[in-house]
A protein has these predicted regions:
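Non-catalytic, glycine-rich low-complexity segments
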Residues: 23-50, 63-106, 113-121, 159-226, ...
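Accessory beta-strand-rich segments of carbohydrate-active enzymes
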Residues: 25, 29-30, 44-50, 87, ...
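Extended substrate-binding grooves/exosites of carbohydrate-active enzymes
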Residues: 31, 35, 66-81, 130, ...
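Short flexible loop/turn segments that cap and initiate beta-strands
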Residues: 57, 226-231, 273-280, 622, ...
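Short glycine/proline/serine/threonine-rich loop/turn segments at secondary-structure transition edges
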Residues: 107-111, 150-157, 171, 225, ...
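Beta-strand-rich binding/interaction modules
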Residues: 127, 209-250, 259, 616-637, ...
């Protein structure tokens, strides 16, 4: 036995020398017992309630539907007037999920966990009819240990049940219903890093060096003590080891120990907005010299600080936080967002110059934080809204921070939003305790709140690190004077003006939703001019105040819910609508924060019946000046408005505020309407550098299809659709006239078809008063546009999306899907116990993607190695073969009685895997 053990130790030593210590060789993490598998597919769902124990024939015969996660049943409707307006008049009910899980025999001596990234809300989980746990919050992730409740065997089902009660809402917004984020199955050795158990901080950072501290919580769930060795390797983006730490400690049975390790990185590559560089840390656990766990943590190195007079600094550079609020939903899908939607949302905002995302009003989705890390978007991570109680607040603080504290994008933990306890003794008590806990869990980040009431009472403003206000810039000015030591971070919300894409308040017809707007605004229809004016006035004040770190637009993107009055199913206060179509106000930010020459004019130029009447034409630009022309006749040149003068404490007595603060930030012409072409020419140094034209269009004639994100980024920046059954593509349909101009008032019904097995999982048009079904294959255009969301299958290749409409020329677009990238090998053994010398075990190595799904097209060369009392079928301890349909297979046979056999599978560029076989 000692011979086999020594050989395996030598193999691991050579593996690490070859992969870690060569300056020219990428490091690949060594094989371990940890396996993480996504379990999103093939759940059964029903929207009704019954006891879990009622697993009768009657219950099984109910109309359960097959669903895949993420899943939001509320968005399926129907819209009913008697339902809650904050939830978009959509149902909030009780639902049940069930799923059979199969665990191979080789997991029998491991730990088995289930992880839910988010379930809305008040969920209960059963495994094989045993109640595992209850989780109240709809926004924090949670983990359950299933080990004592599951059975093992490829043909033995384990019955998983989840009851979700979404009747009571947490926030005053649309929150959806169901398991709306990913779910995972995690298998580990009994000696393992706890889930979310590694915390990496950078206490001292300069361009020359960075000091890294890694805290790693290791659990020993064996019934005997274990001598644990933890080796932590820091890997740069090229895969090279840049630092390494090692420490050993004896951990008693059924207990845990937190390792604290420190190392120095020379010439660290700092994470920044324009260069979001990421490192990886691998925590490698050895038990008696055998590697049993490898845990990956992604992090970035950067510094930041808030200054009471000068605002925010990132890596020593002063930066204005150009922020936006956003919920977590989308047209047609509700809250059940595929990962690509998070990328679409954050990238669309970043392309306008936004650099700061506030996850109002809940902890951000893990995948959205990953995107922010990757593209360089700072984050305000909101933990709680109400300050419900000490118990609830502190639990949410712990759950959120432990999960999210390694994301370099996160800079602030927000402890409440517009709580009625602001400025009270009880509120100060809760928020002080929350700040203390936040600092204990994460000493590197700061706490804040989003206040709507005075916070200069009862020590409330002193209870957090950064003071932030919703809308009250005058209150912020006074508090800055009265409390000069306060770090007044942001207007955490500003504007809140509503505006519908393509609606200007001068239309000669009425829409169904106009009556609702009249009710809301005392007879005044909110329109795009008013929305833009309000946004301009707020941002102009923010940038005039040096002490302000920045501000967060309310909101960046339209969200379901909070319409306030029937039939509105959304507030409509975003710079993007529910489909991510830009409204005119979006281009205000483009003009403020981007360098490439641009000019944007509005409104559209279809005003039949208003000939000769003056139309207000507004223009946003980052050029020196703009010339406007109507049918090639110049209407004059206007210079870009000047920047505001900086605010000083003396300005506070100016009522109304100084003129420089309230000056508009757009150019404006009154143009007597005549059909034709209106053109804006952006000038720099007197030369035209950009042009936008708007034409009076003809009648709808044809449909044009394209990928939605081409409105924001070049096609080359958009990742191909992945054929994994999870990825999606959003197809935009535009209604064009004969000259191929978008008809800005078109509302034609568009029918979508997919000419393969891909599925249409939702449709939308951005109309906040539409009650059309979200789960459909057709949708009316709203002001010329609509979308369909297409989900991939697990078959790579090309598929065609086609769109038709009565009386219009149809269009089609070809979309290519590619096979998922192979990431890792997972190894199985059947049987995993050998009791006879002539018995064999089949070892199967699966080539898997990042979700833990087998890649059926994979043909990678796989090398098997073993140590222990066994040989491969070729009578050696090494066997190489090619995978077929994603699997490489080999048999082993015992060489002698007694002992453990460890089989490792390796393939170039992939994370290797291992499995144990017991020879009796």
């Amino acid at each position: 036995m000692m011979k086999w053990k020594n050989l395996f130790i030598l193999f691991l030593l050579l593996f690490n020398i070859e992969n870690a210590f060569s300056k020219n060789t990428k490091f690949y993490p060594p094989p371990s017992d940890r396996v993480k598998t996504n379990i999103d597919f093939d759940w059964k769902f029903i929207s009704r309630d019954f006891p879990c124990e009622e697993e009768t024939h009657q219950v099984n015969e109910l109309p359960w539907q097959t669903v895949h996660l993420p899943h939001d049943w509320s968005i399926e409707g129907p819209f009913l007037r008697e339902q809650n307006t904050t939830q978009g008049f959509l149902p909030m009910t009780i639902g049940w999920y069930k799923k059979s899980i199969f665990l191979p025999e080789c997991y029998e001596h491991k730990k088995v966990f289930i992880v839910f990234d988010g379930v809305y809300r008040s969920s209960d989980v059963w495994m094989n009819y045993a109640h595992i746990g209850h989780h109240e919050s709809g926004y924090t992730s949670f983990v359950y240990d299933l080990t004592d409740y599951v059975r093992f065997g490829n043909r033995i089902p384990n019955g998983l049940r989840v009851r979700v009660d979404a009747r009571r809402h947490e926030q005053d917004m649309y929150e959806g219903c169901g398991i709306y984020r990913h779910a995972w199955l995690v298998v580990t050795n009994k000696l393992h890093v706890a889930y979310w158990g590694a915390f990496i901080s950078t206490s001292k950072v300069s361009r020359a060096k960075a000091t890294i501290e890694v805290k790693t919580k290791v659990k020993n769930e064996n019934c005997t003590s274990r001598k644990c060795k933890l080796t932590t390797k820091i890997i740069d983006a090229e895969g090279i080891v840049v630092a390494e730490m090692a420490e050993s400690h004896s951990i008693p049975a059924n207990s845990e120990y937190e390792f604290i390790q420190r190392a120095q990185i020379d010439r660290p590559h700092l994470w920044s907005l324009d260069d979001p560089y990421l490192y990886k840390a691998y925590s490698i656990i050895q038990d008696d010299d055998i590697i049993v766990d490898t845990y990956e943590t992604i992090f970035g190195i950067r510094t930041f600080r808030f200054d009471s007079q000068k605002g925010f600094f990132l890596n020593g550079e002063r930066i204005k936080l150009r922020g936006f609020n956003a919920h977590y939903d989308f047209a047609g899908l509700g809250t059940a967002l595929p990962d690509r939607i998070h990328w679409n949302a954050m990238m669309a905002m970043k392309k306008a110059g936004f650099n700061f995302y506030r996850s109002s009003h809940n902890p951000a989705t893990p995948e959205r934080l990953d995107v922010c890390d990757q593209i360089g978007m700072l984050v305000w991570d909101e933990i709680e809204r109400k300050l419900e109680s000490h118990e609830v607040e502190l639990a949410l603080v712990r759950e959120t921070i432990v999960r999210d504290r390694n994301h370099p994008s996160v800079i602030l933990w927000s402890l409440e939003n517009e709580s009625p306890l602001e400025g009270t003794v009880y509120g100060t008590s809760i928020i002080s305790a929350a700040t203390a806990l936040a600092h204990k869990l994460d000493p590197t980040r700061l706490t804040t709140f989003a206040a709507s009431m005075p916070v200069n009472k009862k020590g409330y403003g002193d209870a957090v690190d950064v003071v932030s206000y919703n809308y009250h810039w005058k209150r912020a000015d006074q508090d800055h004077i009265d409390n000069p030591h306060w770090k007044i971070g942001l207007l955490s919300e500003y504007s809140a003006a509503r505006g519908r894409r393509g609606v200007y308040g001068i239309e000669h017809f009425r829409r169904a939703e106009d009556d609702a707007y009249f009710d809301l605004y005392n007879g005044m229809v909110q329109n795009m001019y008013q929305m833009c004016s309000r946004v301009e006035s707020y941002w102009r004040r923010i940038k005039a105040r040096e002490y302000f770190a920045g501000g967060c637009l309310w909101s960046g993107i339209d969200a379901w819910g909070e319409g306030n009055v029937w039939p509105l199913v959304s507030r409509g206060d975003g710079a993007l609508d529910l489909c991510f179509f830009p409204k005119d106000v979006y281009y205000y930010f483009v003009s403020q924060w981007t360098e490439a020459p641009m000019v944007h004019i509005f409104p559209h130029w279809n005003w039949e019946g208003k000939e000769g009447q003056p139309i207000d034409v507004w223009c946003y630009t980052n050029c020196d000046s703009v010339e406007l022309l109507l049918n090639d006749h110049s209407l004059g040149i206007q210079a870009r408005p000047p920047e505001p003068a900086f605010w000083t404490p003396d300005s506070i007595d100016n009522v109304p505020p100084a003129k420089s603060e309230t000056q508009v930030e757009h150019l404006e012409w009154k143009v007597p309407y005549e059909p034709g072409t209106i053109r804006a020419s952006g000038l720099r140094a007197g030369q035209s550098v950009c042009i936008q034209e708007i034409h009076t269009t003809g009648k709808p004639a044809k449909i044009n299809l394209c990928r939605l994100m081409t409105d924001f980024v070049h096609e080359s920046e958009i990742e191909p659709v992945i054929a994994d059954g999870r990825d999606i593509v959003v197809i935009k349909a535009a209604i064009l006239d004969e000259a191929e101009n978008v008809v800005p008032t078109a509302d034609n019904l568009v029918n979508f078809y997919v000419e393969r097995d891909e599925k249409i999982i939702g449709v939308g048009n951005g109309n906040i008063a539409s009650h059309e079904p979200n789960k459909a294959t057709s949708r009316k255009a709203y002001n010329g546009l609509c979308v369909a969301i297409i989900q991939s299958t697990q078959t790579a290749g090309e598929f065609t999306v086609r769109a038709t409409s009565p009386g219009l020329i149809s269009d089609r677009i070809k979309i290519k899907s590619i096979a998922p990238e192979p990431v890792k090998i997972v190894v199985f053994a059947k049987p995993y116990r050998l009791s006879k010398l002539d018995q064999t075990s089949t070892i199967t190595a699966e080539i898997q993607d990042k979700f833990g799904s087998i890649i059926l097209t994979a043909e990678n060369k796989v090398t098997f190695k073993l140590n222990g009392p066994a040989l491969f079928e070729n009578d050696t301890d090494t066997f190489t073969t090619n995978a077929i349909n994603g699997k490489a297979v080999v048999k082993i046979k015992p060489a002698e009685r007694g002992g453990s056999v460890i089989i490792t599978a390796l393939s170039a560029g992939l994370r290797s895997g291992k499995v144990d076989v017991i020879v009796k």
